[in-house]
Amino acid sequence: MGESTSGSDWMSAAESHRARGVADWRVTGTGPQAVFTATSLSHAARLIAPVVAATERLGILPDVDVRPEGVVVRIPSRSSAGIPAAATEFAAAVSQAAAELLLTADPSLAQSIGIYVAQHSQADVRPFFMAALGYEAFGDTDAVDPLRCGPQLAFNPITGDPPARGRTHLDIFVPADQAQARVDAALTAGGRLADDSHAPAWWSLASPDNHGIDIAAWTDTWSR
């Protein structure tokens, strides 16, 4: 079983990448993720049985998205403590099964999208968004789709703005080795670099009409 170097039941993204057999996997904003391309829906669906077998053996509860183009396997974040230690053994088992089925890993397709709702310090808008979207609370400040199909929401206060105004931007979590290319593509498409002081953890971009997007890679590299 994969274990963290600290001997706990949890590990960081950096620790998970050091495990054997997990080269196909990247850690996004919703946890470890791998994408395997397929030739058809039936080809992609053949990975389900090995995933279920690994789930029953290791106790990892994945989210699996099967499409004609391929299959996405995610190990969703269920705790702020980090990635479950058993996740690396699960990931290696899934990757081995995918290779045997001639499914092709493509880490460049891994990503997750989050919505960052910046609220005035005197406001609490999380209940409104939870009610409107049918979401449930996740931790003290976030909200999630109960089936983890929609983007995760994060709520954090801002100061200096009038209470009547809210500001929201998208967080795009991508593999660390894909982040710069994604930033460059967005800038080429007319975007503006608003702030790169936190790079390579994340870059803040603005669209031509000033909508905000953060391209974030820190989830794929963080360590304790």
Report residues per predicted region:
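N-terminal beta-strand motif that seeds the catalytic metal site of vicinal oxygen chelate
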Residues: 99-124, 168-169, 219-224
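Conserved active-site tyrosine of GNAT-family acetyltransferases
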Residues: 125, 129-130, 186, 210
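Short, conserved charged micro-motifs
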Residues: 41-47, 82-85, 123-125, 177-182
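Positively charged, low-complexity terminal tracts
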Residues: 49, 130, 137-138
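Vicinal oxygen chelate
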Residues: 2, 66-67, 73-85, 89-92, 112-120, 162-183, 202-206, ...
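Iron-associated oxidoreductase/ferritin-like identity signal
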Residues: 125, 133, 149-156, 162, ...
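Charge-rich, low-complexity N-terminal segments
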Residues: 2-22, 29-32, 37-77, 85-114
